[in-house]
Amino acid sequence: MDFTLMLPLICVFGADILFFTTIKSNKLDFKGKDQYRFIIPGIVILFIGSLFAGKNFTFENILITIGLIIFALLGNTCGVGKKGITTGSWFTAWSKVDDIYVENQGDKCILFYSNKNIKKRLIFKKEEENELKKYIENIIKDYNIKK
């Protein structure tokens, strides 16, 4: 196995480990969906499709595929917890959030939040709206976040 194949393996499995530790260390009280939740699984499907099209089933490619499938499953974990917000396995601590609010849009409840660099939204079930609003109100009070 040469270096050009080792580097993707190291990166993919390193990202898997990073995502797994992020998810495990930040217990989610409310699980939601990210607005871009189809991107990572789409990339994995394209990669697997290219392997089938090229009939390039080497041991290294199979290992990368296994790592990418784990990446696709872990990479879409989103929600709100006591320590902060997890979006696609990217963790944002409450101290980094500048603005946050919950809005009702039809049959879903949407949490909007932003900091200096990003504006994101998470989609939750309509049934969780009241509990989520109370939870966010407490977080706003505890961390002095703008509403």
Walk through the language-model features, giving the residues of each.
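Eukaryotic intrinsically disordered, low-complexity regulatory linkers and tails enriched in Ser/Thr/Pro
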Residues: M1-V80, T87, K147
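A short, compositionally biased
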Residues: V80-G81, N104-K108
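Alpha-helical transmembrane segments and their immediate juxtamembrane interface regions
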Residues: K82-K83, V97
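Short hydrophobic/aromatic-rich beta-strand segments that constitute the beta-sheet cores
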Residues: I85-T87, F112
